[in-house]
């Protein structure tokens, strides 16, 4: 599946420059190159598997192109609908509110004030329009961002009235968020809102951006892994119960692309146990990536999806080669920071240091905070003192992060060197996974690094 994912990603990356030819020529060419690299020697028995996988790749390529090139649903029409608010997020100086309508899918409306909360049901009338076109001097594409999240267009609401609430995942998320705000200390509530329901506090998010650790607030493989580990502690290896807990948590937190990727990998692992087959970690990551691209090809342009897949590939390839877990965090940072620098302009250098121990720190802190929050909701005696101790733990982290940030106030920008470091490191570990000769790995690292720089230049 590594060859399939490599081909599809390359085709999507070149789509803006080559159009349909990126999926007609680039996808099969990259797929073929990776497949031949993975073969130690040519043998007749390889050809049936190669042709079958090539056919599958071409079908995936056709699916991606047909979705990406298709126009959005017809907009610029007046509609009267009922719907449920599924997401409210800050969007510059306004709020972006996603409404899931009963018959026309999802639309986003931009409001000056947050008049709605998640789970609110409304009856409204308004007009729809297409997304803003991409500006020449901007890398942000509004249409791709929202279409990756299943949103069909922009809605301008003229009149609305609230309807009685129904049970929905969005309503549950809002109730949990409100309870955390009422019963938890402020900082702990912000961290648990991010971990439990995927809601980010703007001030906390800005601080983590300064430290280079904002990925800890996004629900990702880190959070999904912690939840799965805790579930396994209580329920053992019961695949059905673990699967239910896994997907309830993912959808409760908003089903972010990074969380979906982690969920699919864990689900593949759990299913392999049922069928008595050994799950190969790199293959599981690639399978999850391909499934998500087929489900929503626009996810390729989501920075969270790209970082998630790259991180997971590095971790999987390293552990499959028997690497120490101590080397995992710096290796993941080397691979991902060029993408972050390209998207946001630069990354704090201190993040490379803090991320060596931040995941371990937060895995313990969030686990204890979650346990304390449950006890607090159940009104256990003295649970409020446990939450004060947890609040102190998060405050201590801020002091530590601020201290190191003051010592290392440097930033790293995107350039040819960072592009080569990121892609070269990823290629190195994947080359080791494919058991390529050192000279071949070095040659591929150079080609991939140069290609990555040319793609994003």
Label each PLM-derived region with a short phrase.
Residues 1-71, 158, 261, 416-418, ...:
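N-terminal leader/targeting segments
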Residues 5-9, 257-446, 452-457:
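Internal transmembrane alpha-helical bundles of multi-pass membrane proteins
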Residues 74-90:
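Structural detector for short beta-strands of small beta-barrel domains
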Residues 81-82, 118-136:
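Flexible glycine-rich surface loops and low-complexity tracts that mediate binding to linear polymers
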Residues 90-98:
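Short aromatic-glycine-enriched beta-strand elements
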Residues 148-274:
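Aromatic-rich juxtamembrane segments at the membrane interface
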